[in-house]
Amino acid sequence: TLTSFGEWR
């Protein structure tokens, strides 16, 4: 998942 701040989770 790509978060709203641009980090992969």
Swiss-Prot record:
GO terms for biological process: proteolysis; venom-mediated edema in another organism; venom-mediated fibrinogenolysis in another organism; venom-mediated fibrinolysis. Its main location: secreted. Its cofactor is Zn(2+). Inhibited by EDTA and 1,10-phenanthroline. Not inhibited by beta-mercaptoethanol, benzamidine and aprotinin. It is found in: Secreted. Keywords: Disulfide bond, Fibrinogenolytic toxin, Fibrinolytic toxin, Hemostasis impairing toxin, Hydrolase, Metal-binding, Metalloprotease, Protease, Secreted, Toxin, Zinc. Its EC number is 3.4.24.-. It comes from the Eukaryota. Contains 7 disulfide bonds. One of its GO terms (molecular function) is toxin activity. Expressed by the venom gland. Binds 1 zinc ion per subunit. Coiled coil: none annotated. The keyword Hydrolase applies. One of its GO terms (cellular component) is extracellular region. It is an enzyme of class 3 (hydrolase). Belongs to the venom metalloproteinase (M12B) family. P-I subfamily. Negative results: is devoid of coagulant activities on bovine plasma. In vivo, does not induce hemorrhage on mice back skin when 50 ug of enzyme are intradermally injected. Snake venom zinc metalloprotease that has fibrino(geno)lytic activities. Hydrolyzes the alpha-chain (FGA) and more slowly the beta-chain of fibrinogen (FGB), without affecting the gamma-chain. Preferentially hydrolyzes the beta-chain (FGB) of fibrin. In vivo, shows a low edema-inducing effect. This action may be attributed to degradation of proteins in the cell membrane and consequent release of inflammatory mediators and leukocyte infiltrate. Monomer. This is Snake venom metalloproteinase BleucMP.
